């Protein structure tokens, strides 16, 4: 079937898409309508924890679909209870509210913090966030984000999100006032170019929050669920946040997110928060399967081996092509280029024949890599070899 035969005009135009339609996927590979295969190092922007169509997920979904799909969040269901127990047992948090997307989880975190401020800090509502941070595309989460240009898009913004600089504790300290209720950040700024927070900064934020009696919120929508080398990124900084959000990897490809909080922060009253599909057993059962897979013996050790392979490979390419190095945490990494030809490299990689390569360029001079956590050694080596050839072709 030719691309022109697909009625793509029925879809609302929100981004520039290439002329291809993906029809199937397996592991680290996708196949389009013409039968061409692509090695996928985007994986839905770090969504597909176990790759495409993971057997563990398919099995969990099929078994749950045969039992119960959505009785309404007004009632308890077993998979959501099981997943909540797993998440709290593996973290510093006591309670979980399930949602459907990262933006929805972050909206919940904002609401919970503001409610806590009303109860405990005389109505304090401001949440300090970071320049170049990304927290979602609802009005509140766009306002919380620090992407250039978003301060005027869909204006007026939701008020109450002063911006500090990541890894600059003084910039945070200068913004704290009587109306401040929390500080919120991504442990690794993904859209900004894969910029990790430093250990000193994260620990400084925790200390600053304690000194001023405010909350410390980590947005682990992209960094959580094994992506950065530990189950949750905050665990590598030796800090205890008050609130954490998860999405992307927790569902492994299906819409699932979570808002986690310590007991003393859980101030929602009945009716303060909700959602038609939140914590439905179908998605929660898949979340249990994803959690159990990545916490099984040997899984994270294998992912860490692929992290070393990716980091070393990117450093070798950087040295060969006189680039500016690589950075990141775990299997969320970036190759920093010496010029703004990342979009051209992404395009050339996708156009490779007979098999393409899918990469991401959040900045003109930067490539981001977000493979499945169970990517094979062979597929990692293949990607690095293909990328070397693409750089050569683009820069010839």
From Swiss-Prot:
SUPFAM superfamilies: PLP-dependent transferases. It comes from the Bacteria. Pyridoxal 5'-phosphate binds at residues 102-103, 134, 219-222, 276. It is found in: Cytoplasm. It is an enzyme of class 2 (transferase). GO terms for biological process: L-arginine biosynthetic process. GO terms for cellular component: cytoplasm. This is Acetylornithine aminotransferase 2. The gene is argD2.
């Amino acid at each position: 079937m030719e691309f022109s035969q697909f009625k793509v005009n029925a879809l609302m135009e929100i981004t520039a898409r290439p002329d291809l339609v993906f029809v199937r996927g397996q592991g680290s590979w996708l196949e389009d309508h013409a039968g061409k295969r692509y090695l996928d190092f985007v994986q839905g922007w770090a969504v597909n924890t176990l790759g495409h169509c993971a057997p563990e997920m398919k099995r969990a979904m099929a078994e749950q679909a045969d039992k119960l799909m959505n009785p309404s969040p007004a009632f308890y269901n077993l998979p959501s209870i099981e997943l909540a127990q797993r998440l709290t047992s593996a973290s510093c948090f006591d309670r979980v509210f399930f949602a459907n997307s990262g933006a929805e989880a972050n909206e919940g975190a904002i609401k919970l913090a503001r409610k806590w401020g009303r109860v405990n800090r005389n109505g304090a509502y401001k949440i300090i966030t970071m320049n170049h941070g990304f927290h979602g595309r609802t009005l509140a989460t766009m306002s919380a984000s620090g992407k250039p240009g978003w301060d005027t898009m869909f204006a007026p913004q939701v008020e109450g999100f002063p911006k500090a600089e990541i890894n600059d504790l003084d910039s945070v300290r200068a913004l704290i006032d009587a109306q401040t209720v929390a500080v919120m950040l991504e442990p690794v700024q993904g859209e900004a170019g894969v910029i990790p927070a430093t250990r000193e900064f994260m620990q400084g934020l925790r200390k600053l929050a304690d000194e001023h009696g405010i909350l410390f919120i980590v947005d682990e929508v992209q960094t959580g669920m094994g992506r950065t080398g530990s189950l949750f990124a905050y665990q590598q900084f030796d800090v205890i946040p008050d609130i954490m959000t998860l999405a992307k990897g927790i569902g492994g490809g299906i819409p699932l997110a979570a808002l986690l909080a310590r007991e003393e922060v859980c101030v929602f009253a009945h009716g303060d928060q909700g959602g038609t599909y939140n914590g439905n057993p179908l998605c929660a059962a898949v979340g249990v399967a994803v959690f159990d897979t990545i916490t099984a013996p040997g899984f994270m050790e294998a992912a860490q081996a692929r992290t070393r392979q990716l980091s070393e490979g990117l450093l070798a390419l950087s040295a060969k092509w006189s680039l500016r190095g690589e950075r990141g945490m775990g299997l969320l990494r970036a190759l920093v280029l010496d010029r703004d030809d990342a979009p051209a490299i992404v395009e050339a990689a996708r156009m490779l024949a007979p098999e393409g390569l899918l990469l991401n360029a959040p900045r003109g001079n930067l490539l981001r890599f977000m493979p499945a956590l169970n990517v094979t050694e062979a597929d990692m080596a293949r990607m690095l070899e293909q990328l070397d050839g693409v750089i050569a072709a683009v820069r010839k």
